């Protein structure tokens, strides 16, 4: 049984449709709706999914910021809710509220039955070209105390101070950064 971990921040009606389509095949869904999103939108989702078997909600709505630890925290809240509500789940499948699955749940089940493996999407940090804009190696070798999006001046001032003082960290030997 797959427990879909649905992280979303907008479009309540789209979230409802997505959760219903994931749950109707017998799987389950744990929803985390961003704490920064309007309470009215969250209430709409709760109402729209009320009484639907196989749907649960994270106990706490985390205020999320792109690229921040808060996204990990929100994920963990949803996984905790899924583990509590659906103890028979054998796999956890994280999906964004902005994305609709391009493969069916049946496809995912067949793949999981066929292969005794966990599947985690990852990209080689240095070789993949996954990072399209902004800093690259600096993401690893310097410490980042400020959010680039919300405190841009402090972010770059901190980065420049570290560069001038030579406060580089080494990437641990033998690790392939994904």
Residue positions per predicted region:
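ER/Golgi luminal nucleotide-sugar-dependent glycosyltransferases, focusing on the catalytic module
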Residues: 1-178
